[in-house]
Amino acid sequence: LELHASTQMTIAEPAAAPFAQALGVTRIVVPRELSVAEIRQFAAGTDAELEVFVHGALCVSWSGQCLTSEAWGGRSANRGQCAQSC
């Protein structure tokens, strides 16, 4: 079973990758807020496989830290039920 760390884990820099890898994670989905330059730096700083969103919804919060959906709609984005309140 492959383990992937999605944006909900808030792994936004390569220094956090070893923690996820120690848990058995093989792929990290980087936050969609990162620029291309930041993604390049991330890739250079880890040997983990990276996945990048290139199109789609951009949260008003930092990926993985949204509380808007829960506050406005009673649906937790951090549990996969984002209401796209933004």
Language-model features: where?
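Active-site pocket-lining/capping segments in soluble small-molecule metabolic enzymes
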Residues: 1-11, 29-30, 38-86
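Short, acidic/polar
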Residues: 11-18
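Acidic, glycine-enriched active-site microenvironments
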Residues: 24, 28
